[in-house]
Structures are given as structure tokens and as C-alpha cells.
């Protein structure tokens, strides 16, 4: 059905209004810029996943597909003007399985992870990610390990299987032991699953600390600008000879060392680090 002339004029006016409003909001409203940037960030990842799926599908579900995802995601930091500095990469054990533990601040953690991700390393993620459209399918093809955190028995069973996989397939896993994104500019208490996994498999733990994003990103303040982030790889922590009884002390010791480094690298060159006292940075 043909539109009457007035409707065409109305559509044209709405189009012109959008052309005017969007740039105005972009330059005049930090909150609008925040929402635009986050929408593009998530949408772009979903689009890249669509491109990655047919390439990864050639191998099927395979940890080597993580190299493809990493290659496709590395450029995102340039789109947002974020400089990622990596220090301590020589601490990665060269030829053995291990468990990476890292602090968890925001969905932007993906940028730091892709920058430093070692070979044959896959994250352990919450099962909900599996249903995140193209991103979920791409992650499944890349060997990401999904855990239903609400079903403790299933999670323990999966961790036992992962321990065997570490040893038999020379795989490394990346775990966020806080269990959820942290909004308070510090570190939440660590859940012990990653440490039980490392002790069960008798493999080292490699702590990785990402500095605070508060100088360029804050969900609570609706602020997202350009900036820099430091990713620090700490020396591996051996677990040989440890038993499940040693896990609580091990988790506390690793968290303490990571928190010390987090405070150090989050205040270095950032005006004394007052923003570390502000809650609400995650997202």
C-alpha cells in the first residue's frame, strides 16, 4: 500500500531529526555516549561471532578455535582508544597445564583477556552465556567450559572432568574466582572452585591482575572514555603436594597477592587512585 504524501514527509522529518539528535547527544551527553558505546561493544561482538562461527565449525568444538576468536577481538581496544599494557607475560609456564585466576570488573575484561590469553587456554563461564546468541555458539565451538553455578553438584562434576582434561589434553583454564563482576573498586572474596581444581590436578595457579578501569569507565556514572589498562601476570603458585585442606589458605594467599598488585597498578600514574574508593565501576 502506497504511503500518502504526508507520511513520506513525516518519515523524512523523523530521519532528519535523528541525524541532528544523535550527533548532539554524542557530543553533549556523556550518558548517551556511554549507552551508544556499550550497545556497539556488545553488538559488534555478536557480529564478529557470526563471522567466526563458520570458520570455527570446520574443526568442531576445539580449544584451538580460541585463537580465531582472539584474533577477531584484538582490534576492539583500538576502536575505543584503550591502551592495554601487559607486564610479566614471561611468568606463564611454557609447556604445562595450569589454572589462570583473574579479577573480574566488567564485560571490558574481555579486552585484557584477549591481549594476554596464552595458547590452549579457555575460560570457565556461567552457563547463561551459552544462550547469548552467536556469542554463545562461538564460545562453545572454542571449547569454553560452561558451569551452572546454581547446581552445585553439576559444577563439582564438571570441575572434576576439567581436572582430567588439563592433564590429558594439555589445556589451561581461565577462571574469575570472584564469581561475579565486582563493583566496589577492590576484590570480592574468592570462591574456591579454581583452587580445588588446581590442587586436584596438581598444576600451578597463574594469577593475573587487571588494573581498575575507573579512569575511563564507570557504569554507575555512565562514563566511558578512552584510557589505559595494565595487565600484570604474577609468578605461578605451585600446588604440588597440597591437599583439599590447604585450599582455603591457598585461596586467601593468592587473593592477598593479587589485591596488593591491584592497588599498586591502579594508583600508578592515575592521580593517587582516589577513584578506587568509588563503588559502581563494574558493568
From Swiss-Prot:
Cellular compartment(s): Endoplasmic reticulum membrane
EC number: 2.3.1.51
Motif mapping: EGTR motif: 178-181
Membrane topology value: Multi-pass membrane protein
Tissues with expression: Widely expressed. Expressed in adipose tissue and at high levels in testis and pancreas. Expressed at lower levels in tissues such as heart, brain, placenta, kidney, lung, spleen, thymus, prostate, ovary, intestine, colon, leukocyte and liver.
Catalytic activity: a 1-acyl-sn-glycero-3-phosphate + an acyl-CoA = a 1,2-diacyl-sn-glycero-3-phosphate + CoA; 1-(9Z-octadecenoyl)-sn-glycero-3-phosphate + (9Z)-octadecenoyl-CoA = 1,2-di-(9Z-octadecenoyl)-sn-glycero-3-phosphate + CoA; 1-(9Z-octadecenoyl)-sn-glycero-3-phosphate + hexadecanoyl-CoA = 1-(9Z)-octadecenoyl-2-hexadecanoyl-sn-glycero-3-phosphate + CoA; heptadecanoyl-CoA + 1-(9Z-octadecenoyl)-sn-glycero-3-phosphate = 1-(9Z)-octadecenoyl-2-heptadecanoyl-sn-glycero-3-phosphate + CoA
Pathway: Phospholipid metabolism; CDP-diacylglycerol biosynthesis; CDP-diacylglycerol from sn-glycerol 3-phosphate: step 2/3
Broad enzyme group: transferase
Pfam families per UniProt: Acyltransferase
Alphabetical GO biological process terms: CDP-diacylglycerol biosynthetic process; phosphatidic acid biosynthetic process; phospholipid metabolic process; positive regulation of cytokine production; positive regulation of cytokine-mediated signaling pathway
SMART domains reported for this sequence: PlsC (SM00563)
One annotated GO molecular function: 1-acylglycerol-3-phosphate O-acyltransferase activity
Side Cytoplasmic, residues: 59-127
Motif HXXXXD motif: where in chain: 104-109
Primary residence: endoplasmic reticulum
Lumenal side: 27-37, 149-283
Position of the signal peptide: 1-26
Keywords: Acyltransferase, Endoplasmic reticulum, Lipid biosynthesis, Lipid metabolism, Membrane, Phospholipid biosynthesis, Phospholipid metabolism, Signal, Transferase, Transmembrane, Transmembrane helix
Record family assignment: Belongs to the 1-acyl-sn-glycerol-3-phosphate acyltransferase family.
Free-text comment about domains: The HXXXXD motif is essential for acyltransferase activity and may constitute the binding site for the phosphate moiety of the glycerol-3-phosphate.
Known role: Converts 1-acyl-sn-glycerol-3-phosphate (lysophosphatidic acid or LPA) into 1,2-diacyl-sn-glycerol-3-phosphate (phosphatidic acid or PA) by incorporating an acyl moiety at the sn-2 position of the glycerol backbone.
Record's protein name: 1-acyl-sn-glycerol-3-phosphate acyltransferase alpha
Biological source species: Homo sapiens (Human)
Lineage of origin: Eukaryota, Metazoa, Chordata, Craniata, Vertebrata
Gene: AGPAT1
